[in-house]
Curated annotation (Swiss-Prot):
It comes from Caenorhabditis elegans. Residues 882-1012 form the Guanylate cyclase domain. Residues 826-854 form a coiled coil. It holds the Pfam family PK_Tyr_Ser-Thr. CDD domains: CHD, PBP1_NPR_GC-like. It is found in: Cell membrane. PANTHER family: GUANYLYL CYCLASE, RECEPTOR-TYPE GUANYLATE CYCLASE GCY-17. Guanylate cyclase involved in the production of the second messenger cGMP. This is Receptor-type guanylate cyclase gcy-17. The chain crosses the membrane at residues 481-501. GO terms for molecular function: ATP binding; GTP binding; guanylate cyclase activity; peptide receptor activity; protein kinase activity. One of its GO terms (cellular component) is plasma membrane.
Amino acid sequence: MLFLRLFIFTPFLILANCQARRTIKVGLLFVQNVSSLQVGIGYRTSAAAVLVTKNKIREDHVLDGFDFEFLWDFDECNEILGAGKTVDLLEVKKVDVIFGPTCSRPALISSALATYYNIPIFEWGLTSTRQLTDVKRFPTTLPFSVNSYSLAMAILGTLKQFQWTEFVFLYCNDGDDEKCESLKDDVQTVASAHEELSLAYTFRIQSKKLEDMRAAIVEIKKRGRIIVACVASGNGSKRTLMQAVALENANNSEYVYIMAETNSRGFVVEEVGGKWHYLWEGKFDDSDTFSTEDSRTSMANLLFLVDNMGMNNVVTPQYLNFSKNVIEMMKDEPFNCVEDCVGEEYSSVAKYAGQLADAFYAYAVAVNRLLTANPQAEIRNGTMILRNIGMTFEGVGGGDLTVDPDSARTSEIIMIGLNSSRLPETYGKLIINNQSVHFEQLYSDEVMDVWNGRQRPKAKPTCGFTGTQCPPDFVRDYLVIVIIIVMFLIFAVSAAVGAVFYAIRQKRKEIERQDELWHVEASHLKPISKKSKSEASQRSFASGPSTSTKLTVESRTETTRFIFYIYQVRNNEVVAANKHDFRPQLTDVERSELRQMRSLDHDNLNKFIGLCLNSQQLLSIWRYCSRGSLADVISRSSMQMDSFFMLSLIRDIANGLGFIHTSMLHFHGYLSSRSCLIDDRWQVKISDFGLNEVRGMDKLSTENMLWWAPEVLRGLEQRSKEADIYSFGIICSEVITRSSAFDLENRKEKPEEIIYQLKKGGFNAIRPSLLTDEALEINPALVHLIRDCWTEKPSERPPIDQVRSLLRGMNDGKKGNLMDHVFNMLETYASTLEEEVNERTKELVEEQKKSDVLLYRMLPKTVAEKLKAGISIEPETFELVTIFFSDVVQFTTLASKCTPLQVVQLLNDLYTIFDSIIEQNDVYKVETIGDGYLCVSGLPHRNGHDHIKHIARMSLAFLSSLAEFRVAHMPSERINLRIGINCGSVVAGVVGLTMPRYCLFGDAVNTASRMESNGKPGRIHVSSEANHLLTHVVGGFRTEERGEVIIKGKGVMNTYWLLGENDSVPVKSNMRKRENTPSMARSITPEI
């Protein structure tokens, strides 16, 4: 180790002696006034760790040519404070590196800011989010803390070590809504990535109350024996959970409970001032009736997976010395914490101070490496520093610490359990490096050490979780009775035994037969074949447009939730398969529910066909309804619905929901307009009912939650009949307004914002709008009913029987069914179709005229007519035409003061004036490129020598129009032009197939461009050829010789200024008028 240090640091020592000492500014973010965090990351017991490490850096001769200046502040684990304090460190104090924040949410914001400034930032403490290890997102961030993904990998390693292939996850967010949610997501991610591992069930405990935890244990016992649990730290939550385990008799040798945490020492609970007690000692409140020994016994099957800052659960002499120095050096410069750091609560070092020390030392070594390789390197370059961070060194705890720039610190998780003496003992160490985990076994005999003489628990008991999967042992249960009966009536006993066995067998056969009815084989599902494109196109041209809302089977495509098949067992019936994300192990209760669902039959209930268990993913099979869902019909808006139509749909939904509420299902749970299907007879059929255990594990989008009742969104209550009534009200609002739930297409809020407001509730809680089309006659009682259905309090919502009764009273005396009503609507539509066709024909003619006008604006009329007739346009030579070029003076300067939208508006206003002037002359506008304007006269319509006259008048009119032109958003600014004119021969023709343009080619075009670029603001620069036509051929115009000018690509040319037309106001007078206007115009239009 000494040789390695000399090898690394000797070159830099030589360099340091030759240069002046430099100072590295170190920024620190701490928690100061949050009492619950003092033990782990408190400022008064952790800040001096950098001073201890600074001494070690000096001893190892790292960065000998540098001094350190420590600048600190307090973010208090608040993301808003964290953002502000980080900006202050970066912008005001100009730090070279940041250590902190120590909590996940502010750490994400600070890391993003550090990435922007390319400043290295080292996270430590309670930063457990996995997002900080994303190198692409945070290339300058290196977390030294253990994140929830590492804990999930540790759980994976433990399960593999003991060959457990199936487990359940139990968690409670009460007291900490971030910790367990993060762990749950990462456990699901790890489980999904390993096929040999099955996360059978995930259950959230409603609160940390004992009764809620007992209810959770009752549910979990039906699902698994290996339970990974997560509850909030402190407040006695772990003790309460294990009490619930004992009360529900779930603490025998069949069960194992695993708790994975970072801010923990397992069974040891730390207190302020270095004190501690065991987890089973002490009571949190008066409701805790368990004795210390009972609580200790309840934890016999509990395993902890915890990070102990590299100390392997043993406090080493090195760490004791480090702890002592941190507390003592808080009184030294620069912290000078004398009076504020006195007290028993500040006598013991913070648990995570070692991470801060290790991170500071790793940073110093990385900078030393960077400067050794390149003495001129920038020490603020976070990306380059982290590229040099890969290393292994001795941490403050005495063990080796490995740092990987791609995956931060290599995590070491220890597994702690209770030995035969009911005292904590370390049974293993798990080394987590990115995607790999290694279990280092620290026990010699698994049975005796880990399980205290018992066999290792199985992931699934032999007789199943409910004990019902083992056949009854008739001999064992009835042996005495059999012997007695055999002694007296051997024949009767034989007959009785035979009858019992026969009855059991027949019952099982009946259950198996009924199970076969709902079990759908994947081989019996045939994908629906698609028609060829040519066939579909021929059908489309043959049939023309249609207003039908009925969807053909071929038009149905696979979605994220549904796929459509032909079920060959039921006469090739078309079915819809609902895809589910998880494949749980079905219990006997769930199988019984499936058998009953298979037998449900109602006019307004979609038929449940069964489950497909042997496909790639779990599928629930339902009867196909040709018109799709109610949401589809509303979104297509192709069928006009009157009030009778709407009321019929609503009544169908109410009837179907009433049947569900009185059936064995009791409630739907996920009712929405997407689960209300419509068949070809326009009858609503409710689908997607039942299977609540399966649906509860599906990943649903935020939009799917818009129909959920507020109490369900908040997690305060389970799904219920009252929640169905709320969903029914949302669906009714969609029907009468003919829009989606909450009219998302026309709202500024996103679904996430609406869900947040629904959870928030309040007196004026957010609900969909009930504004309907004025042409519809909606019964006011229906609107009142909808409002009653979605009221905030579940107890105030009307039951479904009352809803159905009210709907029957809204029929307004109308009789007949919905199909008759639809046929009457279609008959009325057919009678008006001919009139509508004639009206559409007139509209087509008008649109054709508009298209012609648009075409004539893009191309000359003669050219456009030829193209419409299919005649190719050959290039044509024009012997003499006049070309006009102009651009806006200092347009770049003006555009820099405007937004892009304002620049477009400015040019649009200016060119609108110019286009109106062009229409008064025989001039063709070729194109505009930015502020450049190109026009020509004399083509495609030849006009003799009048082309020079038209261009000259247009140019004078352009300059005259600028006197009154104002920039809309900058009224004080003035616009000026530079204009060039030339006469000569050109070739014109249509170029290109995509967006064809009528373009000009020839040297005369280039000369006109040179006249414009070599002109002056507010002047019309003309060539000698154009001047000759103006003064000697056409006449009537006044020009002034400019003299010889060097023209790029042309050499020396004699050019002229066009002053004006005889008997008209000269151009110079307009210039003087503009120059005398007070404004910033002079900055845009320089004086001539």
